[in-house]
Amino acid sequence: MKQKLIKKNMFLFFLMAPLLLLAQDVVKGKVTDSSLGDPLPGVNVVIKGTTTGTTTDFDGNYELSVDNFPSILVFSSLGYASKEMQVSGPSTLNVALDESATGLEEVVVTGLATSVKRSNAANAVASVSADELTGRTPPQTLDGALAGKFAGAQITAASGAPGGGMSVKLRGVTSINGQGQPLYIIDGVYVNNNSVYAGGLNEISNAAGGGASSTDSQDNASNRIADINPDDIQNIEILKGASASAIYGSRAAAGVIIITTKKGKAGKTKINVSQALGWNEAVNLLGQRNWTAALAESVYGEGALYTAAESAGRLRDYEKVIYGEKGFITNTNLSISGGGEKTSFFGSFTNNEEDGIVKRTGASKQSLRLNVDHRITDDIKLSLTGNYLKSSADRGFFNNDNSNTTIGVSLLFTRPWDYLLPDADGNYPDHPANSSNQIHTRDVMTNNESVSRLIAGGALDVNLFRNENQSLKMILKAGVDTYTLKTTVFFPRELQFMSPAVGGVDGLSSDGTTQNADANFSGFLVHNFRTDNELSFTTQAGVTNEQFSQNTVRVTSTGLIASEQNVDQAANVKVDQFRLEQEDAGFFVQEEVNYQDKIVGTLGIRGDKSSNNGDANKLFYYPKASLAANIHNFDFWNIEAMNQLKLRAAYGEAGNFAPNGALFTTYINSLISGNVGIITPATLGDPSIQPERQKEFEIGLDAGFFNNKVTLEFTWYNKKVEDLILQADNEPSSGYTFRWANAGALENKGAEIGLNVNAFDSENFSWDSGIIWFRNRSEITELTVASFDTQGFGTGLGTFRIEEGKSATQIVGNDENGNVVALGDAEPDFQMSFNNNFKYKDFTLSFFWHWKKGGDNVNLSRLLSDFGNTSADYDKMNLDPSGTLNNGDYRKSAFGGGFADPFVEDASYLKLREIGLYYNLPENALQKLFNGNVSNVKVGLSGHNIINIFDYNSYDPEVSNFGSTAAGIGIEVAPFPSSKRFMFHLSIGL
């Protein structure tokens, strides 16, 4: 009996032993957000020194088998500081992660298929959080909201009108004629940021020769990234160097801006409603000349008219009449998010409306978004994102004008005694001193741009294999960005400058439509392997394919019948069309080696081919390499005050394909003796042109002091661009004036510094501050063609010139002796920003200053006001060295003599870019007022550009007539002035 009992117990022991052992080596728990207490799904939980790990489910729960104790578990998630926790045995371990927008332990996206801790990244990666982007005040556009918030970017507006275009340059000029703006990627979708000029305003203003090109940079178009709703964004990461952006292909030659939108979290469904109301007003006005009857008589012989207008109370400041409006602003946002065990979602609807500071101008935008994440199994995850956008913008009639017809130019020729208002019957008088009555133009013309857009994408993550030392993952991504852009331009025949008697076209109506479709597909394999001595290898390989097409059709009619707006009701009808189809494909391979987080090295190569090459199947190869050394992780490190020190170096190459049309010769249709035919263009294409090749080397250090209370980042870079694609003179006997050729090289050198200080952090009060400083210097290091001008209006006024040994953004002009000399440079001496955040109990105060030191503009607005004899400083005597001429006559004399120096001005500024003051209702008040049904209530007020300090003699040194060009920003011709904004806010969370 006793033996039977022993045998029975032994049988039960061996039966239960595996279960007992299984129960003994499990560590489980929950991961939450430290500030909100919400569960965090998708957090990586890995046993340090191995590849063994798991991810939290949609409730933030995890369960991990651990073979050996004690062990260290590493918890990491995008947007949060990583945390390491030691476990000495089977247990329940709950962990709270802190959000980290600037910490060195933040996880950042640096590859097509992988992410890395910031402390291990060998490249300078800038990050902008949702709070930094929209937390102070709602921005007009996404790209405009980035100004001054990270090092290395020069951002310039093409118009101050709501919805106007912007230019973003990272680390200087990347190309003269090719792509000069960064690639934008939203949740894995390559989005289109082209400026499409389909309006036809040049037909009226005769700017750029009155051309009707869909690529004419003077037609005041907006960048399409302006469509994106900033309130949907969770985080933005900026890859500025070729070593980081190389694997994204040739579209990323000018850098990459990676945008991650908000996601849902498991748990209670959350609803948030926010409303912002406010107004805008002009940043600065030029003012008017100090007119008197005697002065009016002296200049125009119209002293009696001045006196009569003065007696009748009809002296008007027409600048305030045009730019004196206070535009109403409303931003409404509704979001809902939540999820269950396997599925989470985020949805939002936004409606933004903003009137301009000029009557009948403004912009509106509606956005509808849905993001869904679903874990099909423990090893398969599907992510879907969709965003429908609809926008409309009315931007008036401004910028460059060769016929004195735009509102801005006409205003500069207007005297206070001129009577321009309509009579009782609605009839407008002609302008007595100009070819256009700007009040009439403002009240009846149309310049509308509307967009309907869909951005959608999906990603499938599949864990193919995993054991203690290695894993293999497959990632598939696809995205589409398609939009229809419609432009409507209408100038009725009743306008003064439309009369054929003065050379007008008897009314103009223009309808343009652009159909644009971009698609991207990619597939990756990622293999992780870790040896027993904590040496890890991450291998990734993949293929990509991008397809894009554009079809722009514009119908322009003149000689309208009774000002009929339909384009077929006219004496003359002209049709223009521009079509583009392109396909790019590539592959990449990258190997990352990590030794105990002490030394991290990366090698990679990208191969690219494009239908825009002379040989569409030819691959161009672009290597990259980087090395980061975390000195603080070595055993010899014993400086307690300096808890982190990383030294890094990186090198990379990137390509930039030829601009459209450079590889072939485009013939032009024409009537020849009454018959339809074709003629040769002025420029000869060349299918043998090579892509521009960018080679960039950067070094830097990242440091943390006093447990990262103080962090410092420093980067120095050298970016060389070879095989610049330029237009060269051609032999006249060939029949072509110019030819495309690889004919030069340029170089950018610069430095970037970032310093963040958490000065105080107590229960009731906290203060953190940040400073960013950066500068860039460019030089044309080789030029095998003759020096040439890029943008501007000739050396008599100041123009941008490409010249060997000189800056790529130099401004040249004639001196007093007629010699062409350097007069300035659009590149700033440096830029600097100051960011401060204060929190006292339930109040928060945040403000952000932006300082641009140096950099010059060609200011032609002041010259035009001189021609109109209306400049505010016309009668002052502080410009002429001889003391003989007043300022206005001196500038006109300089123009008459071809002397450009008075028109090139320092464009420095100091701006209070953003400020916000908010109050969060405390929890006890919420409980008392709403019985726990409301989770948060926030009220506040904010401002944008409310303090602007500059000596520049015009509306705003930030606004440029050629704002979207790669080289040549900083030319101003009577633009739509920029505005300051004041807002009130209410936000309620359920």
PLM features: residue spans?
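Short, small/polar-rich motifs associated with maturation and membrane association
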Residues: 1-12, 17-369, 374, 381-389, ...
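Flexible loop and strand-edge segments within Gram-negative outer membrane beta-barrel domains
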Residues: 282, 311-319, 327-361, 367-436, ...
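Surface-exposed loop/turn segments flanking beta-strands in extracellular/periplasmic regions
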Residues: 291-314, 403-440, 491-509, 549-577, ...
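Surface-exposed, extracytoplasmic segments of Gram-negative outer-membrane nutrient-acquisition systems
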Residues: 301, 305, 309, 675-681, ...
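Outer-membrane beta-barrel transmembrane domain signature of Gram-negative proteins
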Residues: 308-337, 492, 502-600, 651, ...
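Outer-membrane beta-barrel transmembrane strands
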Residues: 325-341, 349-352, 438-489, 510-532, ...
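Small-side-chain secondary-structure face that scaffolds active or pore-lining regions
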Residues: 357-367, 373, 387-389, 395-400, ...
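Membrane-interface anchoring segments and C-terminal beta-barrel signals
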Residues: 642, 884-990
